[in-house]
Amino acid sequence: MQRADLPAWLFLLGFVLLLLVNWNSLREQVPLYLSGRKAQQRLQQYLSEREPPLRFVDLGCGTAGTVLQLARQFPRGQFVGVETAPLLFLLAWLRCLLQENCSIRYRSLWQVELGEFDVVYCFLSPVPMLRLWAKAQAEMRTGSWLISNTFEIPGVPADRELDVSEGRQTSLFLWQMKGAEIR
């Protein structure tokens, strides 16, 4: 039986590709989670209840599937995706180039001014949720919404929950920002 030896550079290439895709996992403990079709449909249903024009940001947009789909569905809105994994950012940026109301920024979610948006969407991990909640409370305007796919904010009941039941995605959890006197 003959053994095929792979060139050493293939292993290095594989490592570099994994690093370029999983950059967030190392620093932020947020792996790549892509929103499924049912989650996108539930987001579309929810956004159709909002007053246009709408400003929406996807924190950690991956390949921009969700933000691009929503931008196509709601042409009067402004849709922004932020991503720090280099390869995912490049793919997302290329996908959104021709969609006028969609833009992708190479930026950490912690550098985004959440007050610019009516809806802030994320599909992160349990690790950053409390920190994100503190950031949302400090920056988001009264009446704006924070939406998390699957991951709840510990100790903070959602104002609304939309069932997704698709693979590992269970629900969209929605919190409406209240005025400072109510927090």
Question: Language-model segments: what does each one mean?
Answer:
Residues M1-V21:
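N-terminal auxiliary segments of SAM/dcSAM-dependent transferases
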Residues R27-E139, W145:
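Membrane-proximal soluble helical/coiled-coil segments
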Residues P128-R183:
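C-terminal substrate-binding/active-site "lid" region of AdoMet-derived donor-dependent transferases
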